[in-house]
């Protein structure tokens, strides 16, 4: 059974930065360091940081006064920043800079009195953070999850509306919604540069190239990872049986009955050690040849805050 590895895969610059912020804060200040929400959506990473002394909370009221808090890579609503400021918490912001870019787009649009449509998945932390950037004196911001919802959007000023997208969606699913928005609101304005992040795009392109070449596609990533789910869905849309798994322990022997080739990739929040564990298990299940696919070389680096550089 041939094993083909997608490239690029795994950690992106935003995830790497967020994890480094937590680790460096623990090194500088000692445990505990509080983190609002999972800093990235990966069980292995979160468990590792917990073991080092990080405490993950849902809201700031779970954090005692005088402590350090880190905002996750997904970003937070303005009200959370204001609450932290009022309480005097020491804040380090691990929001991915590409998410911050979307936040600024929403902020600018609301200040201009524009209504804003956010393309994203309800309940995802990034979506909640982005919705929370809209000024209260603005006219309105709306979440849309599929093209069928566009006709029922309660937009009041169709000549003054813009759209933004969650950064971890697939290009395919946003394309249909954007087309519907442009048809329904001809004057709608979009971002100057696509909001889908470079790492999400690169990993999807790698799966798009690899999936048709294999019998089974494995995506290493956690169930609550948006970009990992999109990779699995993309492979399935291309006609390849695909599975999302946290680690090698979730591999099932029957997946590989009469399988001659298997593709492996990883979501942007999944560490390479988990990919390697999957490869090791595939060898035990009959894997005999490992091949690295060609792909985009990523050299983007996002700096951590000055106070946490070591």
UniProtKB/Swiss-Prot annotation:
Single GO molecular function: metal ion binding
Entry keyword annotation includes Ribonucleoprotein: no
Active site per database record: 126 (proton donor)
Binding-site positions, dimethylallyl diphosphate: 41, 74, 124, 225-227, 269
Binding site for (2E)-4-hydroxy-3-methylbut-2-enyl diphosphate: 41, 74, 124, 167, 225-227, 269
Residue spans crossing the bilayer: none
GO process annotations (BP): dimethylallyl diphosphate biosynthetic process; isopentenyl diphosphate biosynthetic process, methylerythritol 4-phosphate pathway; terpenoid biosynthetic process
Role: Catalyzes the conversion of 1-hydroxy-2-methyl-2-(E)-butenyl 4-diphosphate (HMBPP) into a mixture of isopentenyl diphosphate (IPP) and dimethylallyl diphosphate (DMAPP). Acts in the terminal step of the DOXP/MEP pathway for isoprenoid precursor biosynthesis.
Name of the molecule in the record: 4-hydroxy-3-methylbut-2-enyl diphosphate reductase
Phylogenetic classification of the source organism: Bacteria, Pseudomonadati, Pseudomonadota, Gammaproteobacteria, Aeromonadales
């Amino acid at each position: 059974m041939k094993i083909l590895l997608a490239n690029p895969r795994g950690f992106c610059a935003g995830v790497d930065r967020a994890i480094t912020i937590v680790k460096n804060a623990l090194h500088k200040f000692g445990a505990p360091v509080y983190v609002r929400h999972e800093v990235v959506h990966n069980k292995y990473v979160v468990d590792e940081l917990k073991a080092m002394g990080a405490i993950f909370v849902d809201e700031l009221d779970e954090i005692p006064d005088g402590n350090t808090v880190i905002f996750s890579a997904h970003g937070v609503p303005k009200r959370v920043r204001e609450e932290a400021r009022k309480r005097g918490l020491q804040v380090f912001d691990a929001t991915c800079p590409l998410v911050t870019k979307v936040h600024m787009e929403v902020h600018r649009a609301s200040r201009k009195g524009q209504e804003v449509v956010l393309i994203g998945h309800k309940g995802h932390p990034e979506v909640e953070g982005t919705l929370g950037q809209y000024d209260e004196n603005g006219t309105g911001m709306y979440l849309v999850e599929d093209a069928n919802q566009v006709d029922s959007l309660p937009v009041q000023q169709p000549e003054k509306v813009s759209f933004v997208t969650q950064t971890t969606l697939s290009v395919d699913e946003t394309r249909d919604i954007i087309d519907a928005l442009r048809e329904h609101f001809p004057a709608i304005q979009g971002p100057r540069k696509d909001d889908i992040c470079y790492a999400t795009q690169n990993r999807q392109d790698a799966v798009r190239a690899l999936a048709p070449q294999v019998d089974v596609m494995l995506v290493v990533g956690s169930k609550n990872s948006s970009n990992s789910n999109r990779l699995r869905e993309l492979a399935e849309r291309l006609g390849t049986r695909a599975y999302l798994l946290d680690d090698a322990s979730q591999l099932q022997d029957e997946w590989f009955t009469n399988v001659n080739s298997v593709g492996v990739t990883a979501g942007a929040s999944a560490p390479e050690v988990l990919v390697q564990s999957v490869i090791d298990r595939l060898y035990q299940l009959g894997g005999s040849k490992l091949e690295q696919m060609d792909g985009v070389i990523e050299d983007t680096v996002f700096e951590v805050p000055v106070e946490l550089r070591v």
